[in-house]
């Protein structure tokens, strides 16, 4: 009854209860969590916030199809890093980094190839990235991986300002139609995303 009586009102910009629940579930800092209308909204606003004309954004050959779409909408230049036998090749990503590079989109684990990049390779990639380049670590399928060499990206976020981990309720939780995703990032990234994120992007039904 309480929910139905509030359907005539706009949803809150941030659901403190949901953020707290996510932070508790994954042992994260609640102040570094941002909600989105699916993680695809977060991908779009990352491109809007951090890319402009002539900027370059690297994405992998068989990564999420929304990566190049978000780059194009932002007016930036998409740079493809070739995979090796349907697996992300870290050396190919590093080789594509230039002075114009602003973002790197990386899905780990990756759909549709079903492959993942091990921890030591992710750490090597991050060490090769200039501090002003943002690594977007899409961990939408992290719950499907039980392997000692896999990391979901949260450890990198806790230690560095230029990483954002993306997660979703669409896959493991089977709630794709609710359009609910979230990101975990530094305050610097979060503040810039909030500047371009719509005030009512996540609906109330998704947040309860």
Where on the chain are the PLM-derived regions?
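N-terminal small-domain helix-loop-helix segment of the aminotransferase-like
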Residues: 1-41, 45
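Short N-terminal helix/helix-N-cap motif within the alpha/beta-hydrolase-1
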Residues: 38, 44, 62, 114, ...
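Active-site pre-lysine segment of PLP-dependent enzymes
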Residues: 72, 90-99, 112-135, 139-172
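Structural detector of well-ordered beta-strand residues that form the stable sheet scaffold
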Residues: 34, 58, 79, 136, ...
């Amino acid at each position: 009854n309480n929910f139905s009586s509030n359907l005539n009102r706009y949803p809150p910009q941030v659901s403190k209860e949901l953020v707290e629940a996510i932070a508790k579930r994954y042992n994260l800092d609640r102040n570094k969590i941002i909600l989105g209308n699916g993680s695809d909204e977060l991908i779009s606003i990352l491109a809007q916030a951090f890319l402009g004309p002539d900027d370059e954004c690297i994405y992998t050959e068989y990564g999420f199809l929304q990566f190049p779409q978000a780059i194009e909408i932002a007016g930036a230049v998409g740079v493809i890093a070739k995979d090796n036998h349907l697996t992300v090749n870290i050396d190919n990503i590093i080789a594509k980094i230039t002075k114009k590079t602003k973002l790197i989109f990386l899905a780990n684990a990756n759909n549709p190839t079903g492959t993942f990049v091990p921890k030591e390779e992710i750490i090597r990639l991050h060490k090769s990235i200039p501090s002003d380049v943002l690594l977007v670590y899409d961990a939408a399928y992290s719950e499907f991986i039980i392997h000692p060499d896999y990391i979901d990206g949260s450890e990198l976020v806790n230690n560095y300002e230029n990483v954002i981990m993306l997660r979703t309720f669409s896959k493991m939780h089977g709630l794709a139609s609710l359009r609910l995703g979230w990101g975990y990032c530094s305050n610097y990234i979060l503040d810039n995303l909030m500047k371009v994120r719509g005030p009512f992007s996540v609906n109330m039904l998704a947040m309860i």
